Amino acid sequence: MEKWASNQEVLGTWLSLPDSHAAEIAARVDFDYVCIDMQHGMADYQVATVMLQAITLTQKGTPICRVPWNEPGIIGRMLDAGAQGIIIPMVNSAEEAVRAVDATKYPPLGQRSHGPTIIGGRARSLGEEYYLSLIHI
């Protein structure tokens, strides 16, 4: 995440296939990020959760997830599952952008609830500065 914060070039990969082994292999290649594509890829919530865990356990690439649409429930679930970055598509107005960002941050900065499912329960321990929100407009 340090490269993102300092505007350095980052190199990553996208995963469309729902496979935790592919996620682990991609993370071990030493990409800066590995993105699970739930919008156009084949991963559902359960598979994406295992893929995020596989990426996280390598302690290499930042685990990112592109959710299917701008919906607070799925955004929160993927963050709870271990995504350190969320790509939010289908954002068509300033109001929708605010709603998307609110779904990624805990109160008082946003509306995200706390319910981590990730290994070690790190969700809140990382701090807001370690999460990335990318909005497709």
Go through each PLM region and give its residues:
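N-terminal amphipathic alpha-helix/helix-capping segment at the start of soluble metabolic enzymes
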Residues: 1-12, 126-132
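Acidic (Asp/Glu)-rich catalytic clusters
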Residues: 27-28, 51-58, 79-80
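Glycine-enriched alpha-helix->loop->beta-strand junction motifs that scaffold or abut catalytic
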Residues: 29-33, 80-85, 105-106
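Conserved small/polar residues in nucleotide/adenosyl-binding loops
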Residues: 135-137
